[in-house]
């Protein structure tokens, strides 16, 4: 991505696409594949299922910083089931570190593309039609105040909150109050 002109759409698409293809064509290390499959089997077993539906979510090291949010820059894959599909979704998460949108955002914010790491989390999909889902932050995103947990939630998939498709309910949980036993 050296000397990439992010305002040259053709160059951005070619280079971003080339990096994503390299990641998707590569094999995950065997020990990582085994660990993912074992964890997926254990998760499925804990729900008395052979192949439970999961969300494969990305989490980058540069997300939710005081001066850069990175929210929504990488991909999440929902309702994934079966071992091979989980492994492919993990690779797609890794490749999503190099979507055109993510490349542009990092470059505009002054981040080195190769110094941002990414992990993939695998979570059980829940019945969002029977409850709510959303996004939780470990501080107030407006002020940076660190003694609260901020939760944005709505009925349906949490992705609807992340993508701004719904107007979520907003909850502030004051940690000091909880620690004193008040609820």
Residue ranges and their predicted role:
Residues 125:
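Conserved functional hotspots at enzyme active or ligand-binding sites that engage polyanionic ligands
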Residues 1-121:
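N-terminal beta-alpha lobe that positions the nucleotide/phosphoryl donor
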Residues 70-104, 128-183:
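Extended active-site and interfacial segments that coordinate phosphate-rich ligands
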């Amino acid at each position: 991505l050296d000397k990439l002109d992010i305002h040259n759409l053709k160059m951005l698409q070619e280079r971003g696409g080339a990096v994503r293809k390299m990641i998707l064509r590569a094999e995950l290390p065997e020990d990582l594949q085994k660990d993912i499959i074992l964890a997926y089997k254990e998760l499925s077993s804990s729900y008395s299922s052979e192949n439970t539906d999961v969300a494969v979510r990305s989490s980058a090291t540069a997300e939710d910083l005081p001066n850069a949010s990175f929210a929504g820059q990488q991909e999440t894959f929902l309702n994934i089931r079966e071992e091979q599909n989980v492994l492919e979704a993990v690779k797609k998460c890794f490749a999503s570190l190099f979507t055109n949108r993510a490349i542009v955002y990092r470059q505009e914010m002054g981040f080195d593309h190769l110094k941002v790491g990414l992990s993939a989390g695998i979570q059980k999909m829940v019945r969002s039609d029977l409850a709510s889902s959303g996004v939780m932050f470990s501080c107030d995103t407006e002020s940076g105040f660190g003694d609260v947990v901020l939760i944005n939630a709505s009925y349906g998939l949490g992705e609807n909150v992340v993508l701004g498709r719904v107007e979520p309910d907003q909850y502030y949980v004051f940690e000091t109050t909880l620690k004193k036993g008040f609820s």
